[in-house]
């Protein structure tokens, strides 16, 4: 890796660094820093630098700066000129000539005929290509500073000078092909294009890189194009055809190519530099071989500069450190100068030693040198195409020396020629063999270049849980190949947010009211949209980077090992085994070396290596996600900053636009950047707010308070009353809509008043509306069908005016709206009745026609004139009412005088209803009635909110009901008035106190008195009428109620019957299914038990047969044992009889159980027919499940089995003991008898034959009987009984063996007696067998009858 040195600079971070002539130059945003061994110097730039290159041939720096201009500086940092070279006054032509965005790449061109490009150019031989993020490539003439051409894929727009200037994807990489005169560019959309230098058109594209910006473009000395991209690949292209030759996977953020050594230095974002060689094999195929990787232990690398003469790399990292890597390749420049040495190096490899290289001394002749050079050219055709001036001078000097020595050494030359020819031929063969061996080793042994560079350290934040989640996620990605689905959901949310922000921002720009600033607003709008587009591009690039990283991570060997360990291991083992066989076939001696390789390669699957690799892969997944989240956070902050710079922000969330309407002064349009919805912002001075929540109040999202003001964030409105009225035909609202609006307003005011709040400034501009349209029905007339009925949703706003009933009115802001204010407002008194007055004025506004609205209802130039207009329309108040108003409110002296003035005004000639009808001619009687009750001068005489909601007009009742409702309300009001007006003495004293007034005033008072008296009488009469009407209505209601109740009861009964039928049917079906299932289960259980018992009986029979066979064999062997066999058979017969009796008892018990079950079923069926269906569903299920399954199956069976088994065991044991004793005694007696009765042997033979015949008959009869018994009866388990039976068998065998040793004399004496007993027993057995058969037949008949009954019962239950 060489010696690595690091240094740093103060101030801004560096952009790039260069090393030449023993001077290190570091370029930052501010300028140039020059370092050597003794001093340090700084030269500032004209503007902040965004990109810089060093032109070695021109010894100058070329920069792209923040003002989109290109500037040239000398190698010492002194300023030269700028491109374009224009005067200080900036015009629109400057914008057309210069770049429109930041310059990202610069590339100088020399030794090109400018007349091939532009006929107007001079004879200068220096040009410059520049590419910017505006998507254009511009060709400059350096000496004059003029623009020659612009290259772009879009030719739809042309400037006045014929220069193409449009925007597209940003240019991120540039290079120039001098042979074909092609400008090759890479853009941010991942496409590489080649442009004709002369025609300025696109000649083709290089397709292969996936989506992502092209980072680097280089031209090799072999005429190929080398590119790197954000897709983490490096590719080699054929420029003519545009096809990809080869490539490797490595992320190269910046890249440098050395023509002399044919080596590429690729620096990544992880602080590593890959040294890659471009190699051509014998088959003329090209490949990129990674020689080594230099790990600088630094962060991301921004820039590389390679000095080919000293073999030194200057590295600029993202931090302020500048690293210097000496002996980067280990190949000195002197070896590169010499062609012969260079060829040997290329053959043997850059990493091999140079001890065996051939060298030619200066004394060798010119001919030998020519021959050696020709042979070397045959070995490798790729020679250097350019040689600097120093190399040419050295060659000329060598040629002169060789010519001088040529004459002196002709003889030596001939000898040396032959020697050199032979030596070179041998060396040629050796080199060819070495190349072939190296190729084979590289194909078999060389590891592939990893396309993914893993991190050097494992993150401490990596947990076991995240490791498992990461591996599972990578497995899903590998299986589905859908890496895009793994992106964070916030990614798509960001893109959707940008789209919505664009829409909301454009909407704000469109609502700008000033026409003079349209051009300025359009420019702001364009800049706003372009900024959001750049954010979207950044998000796409970020997601593509993440996708490419994850894809490359999945394709790595380590990921394959972790994700598919078994399969990968199997593949690896198979490949290794295949190599093993090949190596064995080639050479047996290589087996040991290969075994070591096998162990090494399989070690990655060991318990030690596999967890480390797993952590490494999971760590990369974790780091990728972490980078993604950090990028998202940074973009989110940038978006927030961008929005704040574009629109004023409240609480860094709500961005303000223009005023929401022309009449509004403190309400602005805005949008919420978090929830992405439009909002309205109300600006208020710092006052206390009490914001209630109701469906008819504008929804408040948030209240933001500052020391200077309060910002109320609320939902925006669509329209108000005035635009709604103007949108109607003839500016007239339908009555249904008026009722809907009034009802909603009353409900909203009722809520506010119940919360001790008064709206205070209710007027049409405060009533916001949202409308929805519904088409009329087909049954309506044709004219009405064409109209649309609008449904209105009312929203009250303006919370700054709303105040608490306990608040101080002077502390709150006052606004215009006195036309809609009540009379007490002039006295600065606020109560709930004030809102009723304002709502009445709005009610008139809704009912008026277009002409009537031109004249305001209450008008005047001052407070007195307004009071006069109020008195003219609603009537003059009484003095006592004024006194009451003054006493109830804390009024100023001016307000008191104003109210006294209202009481002193003359009484209007016309009635208030007539006055109101003149201002709203289309109002109905019920509407006018509601208006008169709302527009009462005295607050406590106005109608309440509850009464207004129950008014006939609001309820939209028919006329008769309206009249009745009006009469009731009038009675209630008259009762209240009587309590206030009577006693008459008070009114008379009030009248007498004013005798000094004019005659007209006294007459008015007398008229008012007469009116009051007449009204009182009318009220009394009306009360009686209403009382009678109420009685009649109550009687009618009672009758109607009774009829309705009867009808409802009948309907309910019918519905209940129908429902009960349905429930019954469902219950029946369920019961049937359950009974069928249970019967099937019982049958299956019985069958299983029968099968088990049959098997057990078969086993018993087999045991019996075995016993018989054993006894027969013993009889054949010894005649003495014949009598014993008969005795054993008798014992067995007795045991069988006992077993039969027990089994019969068991059968009877089981039959009784079955009968019990059937009885239970019958009882259940009877109960089903009697009980209700709802109880049947529960009881039947419980009884069937508990009684049948648990009690019958478990308890009965278990008890019976245990009792039978215990009884059998005890009885068999006792009988076996008795039998064994008897047998022993009998055997002794028989032996004695045998001795005595030897003479009777002939008789015994005959007896034996008869016994055998009888045995066979008995056995045959038993077999037949047992088969019938097994098929028709149910017996208990006999597994334990079998084990018990084995006991007496063993005892009998023991007894038999003991009896063999007894005397044979007893056997003879008792033989006759035994024969007699056998005959008697046989007769008894025959009789018993007959009885058993008869009993079995009877039981079979009973079972058949019972089965028939069960089937009949099931059929009946199914029918039920």
Curated annotation (Swiss-Prot):
What is the top-level taxon of the source organism?
Answer: Eukaryota
Where are the residues of the annotated region Disordered? 959-989, 1258-1311, 1331-1360
Q: Where are the WD repeats?
A: 44-83, 109-152, 166-205, 208-247
Instruction: Give the record's family classification.
Output: Belongs to the protein kinase superfamily. CMGC Ser/Thr protein kinase family.
One of the record's GO molecular function terms:
protein serine/threonine kinase activity
Q: What is known of its domains?
A: The protein kinase domain is predicted to be catalytically inactive.
Q: List the SUPFAM superfamilies hit by this protein, alphabetically.
A: Protein kinase-like (PK-like) (SSF56112), WD40 repeat-like (SSF50978)
The record's listing under InterPro entries reads: Kinase-like_dom_sf (IPR011009), Prot_kinase_dom (IPR000719), WD40/YVTN_repeat-like_dom_sf (IPR015943), WD40_repeat_CS (IPR019775), WD40_repeat_dom_sf (IPR036322), WD40_rpt (IPR001680)
Question: Where does the Protein kinase domain lie?
Answer: 636-954
- Give the Low complexity compositional bias ranges: 959-979
Compositional bias annotation for Basic and acidic residues: 1291-1300
Name under which the protein is recorded: Probable inactive protein kinase DDB_G0270444
Question: Acidic residues bias: where?
Answer: 1301-1311, 1331-1354
From the UniProt record, list the coiled-coil ranges. Answer: 1014-1269, 1297-1352
Please provide the record's keywords in A-Z order: Coiled coil, Repeat, WD repeat
